[in-house]
Amino acid sequence: MAESPGCCSVWARCLHCLYSCHWRKCPRERMQTSKCDCIWFGLLFLTFLLSLSWLYIGLVLLNDLHNFNEFLFRRWGHWMDWSLAFLLVISLLVTYASLLLVLALLLRLCRQPLHLHSLHKVLLLLIMLLVAAGLVGLDIQWQQEWHSLRVSLQATAPFLHIGAAAGIALLAWPVADTFYRIHRRGPKILLLLLFFGVVLVIYLAPLCISSPCIMEPRDLPPKPGLVGHRGAPMLAPENTLMSLRKTAECGATVFETDVMVSSDGVPFLMHDEHLSRTTNVASVFPTRITAHSSDFSWTELKRLNAGSWFLERRPFWGAKPLAGPDQKEAESQTVPALEELLEEAAALNLSIMFDLRRPPQNHTYYDTFVIQTLETVLNARVPQAMVFWLPDEDRANVQRRAPGMRQIYGRQGGNRTERPQFLNLPYQDLPLLDIKALHKDNVSVNLFVVNKPWLFSLLWCAGVDSVTTNDCQLLQQMRYPIWLITPQTYLIIWVITNCVSTMLLLWTFLLQRRFVKKRGKTGLETAVLLTRINNFMME
């Protein structure tokens, strides 16, 4: 569709130069936007939406990114916190797509052609491929993160609605401009139907929004208790006695850890199947780096340092570096035995919850690792009530021999003959839980792993009893959810947002109509003047 030359101001020409990389003024025959240019504009808009969606996904995934770091370490053997690099790359993609889209919209308003340069086209295709690869990888390797996104919408949907209403008001400018330039009735009606169909969906979206943080303040449940995930891993090396003490200082009530059984039958604290991430096994036993953690004897495990790695690698981005006494204490940490942990926890008035890792098949205690661990707990002479027993293996025997221990059940079930009193589930299961009904049945719910204030606030509003976290010092400082609004207030916000957006839409279309009439009148006057000049010269 041919277009008039439009404004020839320096500003418009600069915009055109940035978009098309043509620094010379376009000849009159090129002052038009072809169908191919329109297709590339559509791809640009799609790329912007994809990159913006990926940014949102990335911000949500920051809560679980430590698992991604550990996954890559197990694959590559090199530790790196990918949080900063991840955010930087996504931010660059969104910034580039946003600037290019703004240039295109401004050029459209200035009636300049949308001749996208080949370099921009290649970069847009690369961004689309990169985002698509990220989404496919997420679906293959971490499908549970789709459930994380579903949970996040309960916290962000009210604000996304406001942002969408503002975005559609801005998008109305080029839509109205295009509408008044189209002369055929069919395409004009189709454009209006598509645009206002999207507007209607956005305006009515709050009808589908359900968030536990939309409630009366008087109905806010008590703040969830804190469970230290492997202790306080942002303040001390994970699964160490120092981490246990830092957990108590954070105000947490439970220390969550991982237990393995050594080759000579001593239960000890360790999460990974190999010792290379959290100990100096490479320097002490260089030929056994890939050996299973349970294949080491307790005498060998006591020779390992379990704290120096924490000072060298800084496993969590944003965590403050240790200094002074804390640094010296971290440097001297060793692999603790379960018996040591129980005695220290009893002195600190902390409860213990642990996962029990099955040893390899050729292990001496492959069939009896549960009994070996239970014997250690019973011989420690600590109150049984301070132990939360999580493993499902041989649970009936454990209940019979240690009836005072609190049995906590996970997603995989457990004892079918007894109603559970404690549930330990991933936070992604929140939409599947009826917290109020569980509380009526005297069932306590702990969700893991919760590191970000937005997620903690959401679970607080939902009435969760406790959360397992890596960042107990941050969550301890929270005195109130990040946001909490009453249903009446949210209704007012919804109505005001839609009304303001509607007025902006109407104003935009009326203003664009006025501009079109003004341009038409100016063009008619110019044509009359040129005709008179031409007639005068012919005389």
Curated annotation (Swiss-Prot):
Membrane topology summary: Multi-pass membrane protein
Molecular functions (GO terms): glycerophosphodiester phosphodiesterase activity; glycerophosphoinositol inositolphosphodiesterase activity; metal ion binding
Enzymatic class: hydrolase
Glycosylation: residue positions: N442
Residue sites binding a divalent metal cation per the record: E256, D258, H271
Domain GP-PDE: 224-479
Annotated catalysed reactions: sn-glycero-3-phospho-1D-myo-inositol + H2O = 1D-myo-inositol 1-phosphate + glycerol + H(+)
GO biological-process terms attached to the record: actin filament organization; lipid metabolic process; positive regulation of osteoblast differentiation
Domain of life according to the entry: Eukaryota
Keywords noted in UniProt: Cell membrane, Cytoplasm, Cytoskeleton, Glycoprotein, Hydrolase, Membrane, Metal-binding, Transmembrane, Transmembrane helix
Subcellular location: Cell membrane; Cytoplasm; Cytoplasm, Cytoskeleton
Extracellular side: 60-85, 143-154, 210-490
Cofactor: Ca(2+)
Cytoplasmic side: 1-38, 107-121, 176-188, 512-539
Family: Belongs to the glycerophosphoryl diester phosphodiesterase family.
Function per UniProt: Has glycerophosphoinositol inositolphosphodiesterase activity and specifically hydrolyzes glycerophosphoinositol, with no activity for other substrates such as glycerophosphoinositol 4-phosphate, glycerophosphocholine, glycerophosphoethanolamine, and glycerophosphoserine. Accelerates the program of osteoblast differentiation and growth. May play a role in remodeling of the actin cytoskeleton.
Protein name as it appears in the record: Glycerophosphoinositol inositolphosphodiesterase GDPD2
The organism of origin for this protein: Homo sapiens (Human)
